Amino acid sequence: MKLFFKTYWTYFVSFIIPIIIMIGVYLSQGIYWNSDTSPLLGDGFHQYVIFDIALRNILHGNGSLFYTFTSGLGLNFYALSSYYLGSFLSPLVYFFDLTNMPDAVYLTTLLKFGLIGLSTYFSLNKLFQSIPKPLKLALSTSYALMSFTVSQLEIKTWLDVFILIPLIITGLHLLITEKKILLYFTSLSILFIQNYYFGYMTALFLIFWYLCQISWDFKTRKSSVLDFIVISFLAGMASLIMTLPTLFDLQTHGEKLTEVTKFQTESSWYLDLFAKQFIGSFDTTKYGAIPMIFVGLLPFILTILFFTLKSIKFHVKLIYAIFFAFLIVSFYIEALDLFWQGMHTPNMFLHRYAWIFSTLLIYTAAEVLNRLKEIKIWNFLVSLFLIVTGFLATIYLKSHYSFLTDLNILLTLEFLVVYSLLLLAVIKKFISVNLFAILISLFIMVDMSLNASSQIDGIAKEWGFASRSSYNRDIPAMESFSAYIGNQFTRTEKLQTQTGNDSMKFNYNGISQFSSVRNRSASSTLDKLGFKSSGTNLNLRYANNSILADSLFGIQYNISDSPIDKYGFKDIYQKDNLTLYENQFSLPIAFASQSVYNDVKFTEHTLDNQASFLNQLANVNFDYFSPIPYEKTEKIENTNDLISITSSSNEDAAIQYQIEVPENSQVYLSFTNLHFSNDKQKKVDILVNGEKKTFTTDNVFSFFNIGYTKEKKTFNIHVSFPGNSQVSFESPTFYRLDTLTLTEAIQKIKEQPVTVSTSKNKVFATYDVQQDTSIFFTIPYDKGWSAYQDDKKIEIKQAQTGFMKVDVPKGKGTITLSFIPNSFITGAICSFTSLLLFGIYNYKRKLYKV
């Protein structure tokens, strides 16, 4: 053991230094194991930790890796995992639970920073054996803590990419120089499997990087071209077990390619390259950001030095310069910026390929440190002049970079002086190389620690680390409800949600969803039926819809912290401040239509769509919704078809109405084109006969449940808009839903019973129908679904674009739906074939050598 540690102690140090620094950086935010402040912020809170919880439940036997019903009516979990869960460390979530999952995020994030340091040190040690170990440790720490990784740590699966990149670079070097192909093939295959998005960028990077590497000795290294092409292809092929189903899912449900509408990228300016080389510089991770390229001040200095060294041939410098120039130009030209990102505009976290620039800086700096004794005074002075000129120009014109503070400038100039003095000292041989290595490594650790702390401060101010209490809110009650509901294959929705993925967090089947991986066909259809999912369908929300939609989509349970006043919903269980309500009129997740189902045409009118959809299913022609006349009790201002309400003094804008409601009515208030003067406050408070209801308008329609009455009744309604002195909207409409008519239509569908259950990635629907009909599944249509009856495959048809139906004859039967991601089997065969071909190719190469 002592011998092992003596031999490999630097590997341990390369792993532990980034972890220690990040522990300190986290601590500065009050974050540690089981701390009151969690390590969750932004998407980390709303998405990543929740998907970790879903994976944990699956690993414990509750669910399938292929499909989940806890999001968006149903979702291809395999495709979601390829984007959000691709990590070596994802299986560790098995050992955590819902309550302490933030600690899993804390632990795995620290481990990933450590593993980046370790893999980078391994790479530098293989490629540059003559560089003193402290310098390699300094560079590996710089890479682990570069601005790109720290500022975007909430997207924690991105960190895994940088564990693999140094291994891929090392593998490519071994392929070129020693004809060894295993490391390159293995590491590249794993990257493609873990993260197809960064895999695409890496593939582009490797083309340029390969040209850079063969330029060092073209005559000898050109023979590696065939190996590079074949092994890269086989690595891509080996990943098809994951990437092929994902690509087909993206083809069906992904966003359209972004059109290039302008020449220059947003917010870019001439000195961006220097502005982001100031220690601690942080602008934003939202829109209008310039690239996160800082990887330490010293690598930047050494990269400039690289182009002045005589021992490096001109054509090598030229190839490297072209690569650097192409990257820099890409930061400015919209078309190239999109090209690196697959022709898709990122939803914040811009310039996602900026890590390539940082990677280039590290490995170019290593080339210079490998030639430390060759550096002359004039090399250093030329480089220093260029750097100082760039920094001074940026300082002089810093009005263009409002994020640069005096502290950023002071720290950068101080470290620039320190690095310059140390470089001068080693060039003039005032100090030994070993002493230089130790001293400069210590300063680099401080440099990167300060920068990491600044990045964390930046994202904390921008997104805010969630408190542990906020994360834990409602967990005991929700777990109690989950136990009460049991394993019923029904749907549940929580009315006061914290995230768009609460159903996945608390492990109940629901509608709401917030994910880049989604079934856009289903979401678009649901949008027309009142569950808002506009634009690219990134969000889908349950709130602010009708009880008719509840019935159609099998919402059997509602959870609320206040009375919900919905027809058919009865309170059945209470825990803490939450109450569980059961819907007496919900349909099962699969039900029989009255005849073979034919699509109805949807319009832009949500309630008309709901009515025509239910009528088609029940084979009736009922009117469910009708407007209710109302009286305004206050004067309001009408301009351009908009009603504008302005409050006096500091009061909230408010308006009052009075309506006469017929018996057996569920009442709704619809605002169209509702605009708030305060975009940060978008809630609506409604008092109905003195009883208060609060609604959100965030990512949902402005369609509010006023309440249910069995008898004829007068509703006095007071609508206020907290935090807003002025609001405007089109003339509102009060709607009455006839509950007797709704009940009749739902009962007519229930006359032909269908019993539904599920197991893993299968759904079982047992039916008894009196005529030829369709079994309608309110499950998103996906080509991964197959239907079987009596061990024979039967046809699944799309219904209303987003859903599924299976036509069946009169009688009894059971339909089994099975989900295997589209092209999964083909991808698995390709992956197995790739491994076989790799083995054969490697064997033939060895045979050829012999």
Q: Where do the PLM segments sit?
A:
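Start-transfer (signal-anchor) and selected internal transmembrane alpha helices
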Residues: 1-31, 434-435, 440, 836-850
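Active-site-proximal, structured, solvent-exposed surfaces of multi-pass membrane proteins
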Residues: 2, 631-850
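Membrane-interface coil-to-helix junctions
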Residues: 11, 15-120, 141-162, 201, ...
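Periplasmic/ER-lumenal interhelical loops and adjacent helix-loop junctions
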Residues: 42, 46-47, 53, 88, ...
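Membrane-interface micro-motifs in multi-pass membrane enzymes
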Residues: 78-83, 102-115, 135, 142-166, ...
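Membrane-embedded helix bundles of polyisoprenyl
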Residues: 109, 113-127, 133-176, 180-215, ...
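Extracytoplasmic/lumenal acceptor-recognition loop(s) of multi-pass membrane glycoenzymes
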Residues: 443-464, 483-552, 587-588, 592-604, ...
